[in-house]
Curated annotation (Swiss-Prot):
Keyword Phosphoprotein among record annotations: no
Chitin-binding type-1 domain residues: 1-42
Keyword Disulfide bond among record annotations: yes
InterPro entries membership: Chitin-bd_1 (IPR001002), Endochitinase-like_sf (IPR036861)
Keywords (A to Z) from UniProt: Antimicrobial, Chitin-binding, Disulfide bond, Fungicide, Plant defense
GO molecular function, one term: chitin binding
Domain of life: Eukaryota
Disulfide bridge map: C4-C19, C13-C25, C16-C43, C18-C32, C36-C40
Processing after translation: Contains 5 disulfide bonds.
Protein name per the record: Antimicrobial peptide 1b
One Gene Ontology biological process: killing of cells of another organism
Length: 44
């Protein structure tokens, strides 16, 4: 999986996905909630 955030040298996720606390992309509250690093509300 593509790494994002701190673990991925500041990379953002494709398709407006949230960057979770462990540096992986996803769209569930696990990624978008507590610990989210970027695009936590999509690409607005």
């Amino acid at each position: 999986a593509q790494k994002c955030g701190e673990q991925g040298r500041g990379a953002k996720c494709p398709n407006c996905l949230c960057c979770g606390r462990y540096g992986f992309c996803g769209s569930t509250p696990d990624y978008c909630g507590v610990g989210c690093q970027s695009q936590c509300r999509g690409c607005r």
